[in-house]
Amino acid sequence: MNKTTHYIIALIVMLIFNHGYSQMNYSVKVETGFLKYQFNTVHVDPGPNWKGYNLEGENGIDLNVINGIDFKNKWFIGIGLGYLNFEGLNGLSMFSDFEYLPLKTRLTPLVNLKFGYSHLWNQYENGTGAGLAELCFGINFKLTERLDIYTKSGFLITQQSMLIPIRFGIRF
């Protein structure tokens, strides 16, 4: 390929990235929620060292901070860190967060998906770690161009338990 072709390809790539970056914004979400315990997803035939399920009927609360990128004010992709408290059992969670707002109106539905890891300091030595998966649906209300509030609920599976999260949050 000659120099002209290289310059044209470089120009096209720069224009594509320039257009893409102009529609991306750094964004932060802060959310809190109530986690209503439903049931254990695993049933255990107890052995001599078994100390009980990771969560045994405990409801919880959490506080999450998520840093990410908004793309075209419809898609949000981020990484989050959360504090968990299940009736005295403390823990941390780390997760990836994907959110979709289908409409660009002031009031719009939202779909949220989280995948990650949670660790609880419970009755087991050094606590227990487990995968985390959450699917939520809710409503997003745009207060200003850069400030949204939202509420959502759905299903959360972690620590061998199924929970119903009811969350409220703010995005800026």
Regions found by a protein language model. Give the residues of each.
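Residues that define the transmembrane beta-barrel architecture of outer-membrane proteins
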Residues: 24-26, 57-61, 90-94, 107, ...
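Transmembrane beta-strands of outer-membrane beta-barrel proteins
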Residues: 29-33, 80-82, 110-116, 152-154
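Outer-membrane beta-barrel "beta-signal"
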Residues: 31-35, 98, 161-172
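Gram-negative outer-membrane beta-barrel proteins
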Residues: 36-42, 85-89, 104, 119-123, ...
